[in-house]
Design a protein with these regions (language model features):
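Short, surface-exposed beta-strand/strand-loop-strand elements in extracellular ectodomains
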Residues: 79-97
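Bacterial N-terminal signal peptides that target proteins for export
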Residues: 1-9
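Bacterial N-terminal signal peptides
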Residues: 9-19
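Solvent-exposed serine/threonine-rich low-complexity stretches and specific carbohydrate-binding patches
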Residues: 92-106, 142
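Short, surface-exposed binding/anchoring microloops in extracellular/periplasmic proteins
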Residues: 44-85
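Short, solvent-exposed, Trp/other aromatic-anchored flexible loops in extracytoplasmic proteins
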Residues: 100-133
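Terminal connector regions
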Residues: 123-153
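Boundary of Sec targeting at the N-terminus
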Residues: 25-29, 34
Length: 157
């Protein structure tokens, strides 16, 4: 119990200090990849759900439906399950990442709906894409504590 509490405190400290879920975001030069990806609640989107592919996470919470869109085509798109593995001494969370769904490309014209797992204080749902330099980038889908909207935040494996 005490270990869990300390881990949660370190996680909160890392988030508040670095503004993200992982050191990848805090230590890398920002690249437009994250700004080209968008996530929002299905109820807040302007997409026709009947025209979208739907991916269900294991242990999905039916009302928690997110829409992922992009302004460009991204290769090697994945929907991933995130599980907190550890929090480093510096307060960075490290996640186990399991691919749930793979698609050759996330196309700008083809939004995807994700029926997500229930989230707690850290993201349990995410996406991965390959950026313009060929690197895999993993983003957790988190709920904003300010307005309840969805946010993408880069995470470490």
């Amino acid at each position: 119990m005490r270990k869990r509490f300390l881990g949660a405190m370190l996680l909160a400290l890392g988030i508040s200090l670095f503004g993200g879920w992982g050191s990848a975001q805090a230590n890398s030069v920002p690249e437009p990849t994250q700004s080209m990806l968008h996530v929002c609640w299905l109820k807040d989107s302007h997409v026709n759900p009947a025209a979208c592919e739907v991916v269900r996470m294991p242990e999905a919470f039916e009302p928690a439906k997110a829409v992922v869109t992009s302004s460009v085509d991204f290769p090697d798109f994945q929907v991933v399950a995130l599980d907190l593995r550890e929090v480093t001494e510096e307060g960075y969370p490290i996640f186990n990442v399991q691919s749930i769904y793979y698609k050759d490309f996330l196309r700008a014209t083809e939004p995807i709906i994700i029926v997500m797992r229930d989230s707690e204080s850290f993201p349990r749902n995410g996406i991965a894409v390959r950026d313009s330099l060929g690197r895999e980038r993993i983003f957790g889908i988190a709920i904003s504590g300010e307005d309840g909207s969805l946010l993408l935040s880069e995470v470490d494996r």
